[in-house]
Amino acid sequence: MSNSNIHPTSLIAEKAKLGKNVKIGPYCIIGPEVVLHDNVELKSHVVIEGITEIGENTVIYPFASIGQPPQILKYANERSNTIIGSNNTIREYVTVQAGSQGGGMVTRVGNNNLFMVGVHIGHDCKIGNNVVFANYVSLAGHIEVGDYAIIGGLSAVHQYARIGEYSMIGGLSPVGADVIPFGLVSSKRAVLEGLNLIGMNRKGFDKADSLSALKAIEEIFSGEGNFAERIKQVAEKYKNNSIVMQIIDFLNQDSSRAFCRFEK
């Protein structure tokens, strides 16, 4: 490999094994038992330690940490492994930690996966192929994730859980049990609880208008009959209330999403 592909500020252990056309940007640290296969690219500030193997064409972004010891009290410096397959995209601040004696001694990631910013993959996890983990997904230890699974942002998965193939977990979901293949799982979504009356008062909105607007949204979202008709009725009833009319204007705009509503 040509040294021109390694930034001079990076620290590469002499015993590290680098394939063809490996590119290593500024301030990376590569340990002596690391193997980087052909066409791996480390953008900058990437740390790869331990007995770790990165498959060809994988791209790792700044401040990712791969192959560090597992976060468990029982860890006794056993020589465990981290194996990552080919064609993976590992974005900023992702952590993938090595296996442990209690989990087969290896954390394994397949091919063609996308791990977005801040993803954590704990010790002894087994990740399949073509999965997508959105921002800040957190996997505890010993988790198995099947091929083509998608996990939404800020979701956390309990240790030893299994996530089946082709399943999808919605964002902000705490997952404490197995998810069947093809399953769709999501936590309770945000619900409308009223108006931000304190904030409105601080910004100088008329208190009477604010309280009237609260009644108006209750009529819109909790009233009887057709939703569109309720919007028209409320617009006519409260046409002199600028707060209500601003809400009505928002409701009448095109949107690809539903509205947060009061909990039933």
UniProtKB/Swiss-Prot annotation:
Q: Where is it mostly found? A: cytoplasm
Q: What EC number(s) would the UniProt record show?
A: 2.3.1.129
Report the domain of life of the source organism: Bacteria
Record SUPFAM superfamilies: Trimeric LpxA-like enzymes
Keyword hit for Transferase: yes
Q: Which HAMAP family match?
A: LpxA (MF_00387)
- Tell me which PANTHER family the record gives: ACYL-[ACYL-CARRIER-PROTEIN]--UDP-N-ACETYLGLUCOSAMINE O-ACYLTRANSFERASE (PTHR43480), ACYL-[ACYL-CARRIER-PROTEIN]--UDP-N-ACETYLGLUCOSAMINE O-ACYLTRANSFERASE, MITOCHONDRIAL-RELATED (PTHR43480:SF1)
Q: Briefly, what is this protein's role?
A: Involved in the biosynthesis of lipid A, a phosphorylated glycolipid that anchors the lipopolysaccharide to the outer membrane of the cell.
Please give the name of this protein: Acyl-[acyl-carrier-protein]--UDP-N-acetylglucosamine O-acyltransferase
| Native source species | Rickettsia felis (strain ATCC VR-1525 / URRWXCal2) (Rickettsia azadi)
Gene that this polypeptide is encoded by:
lpxA
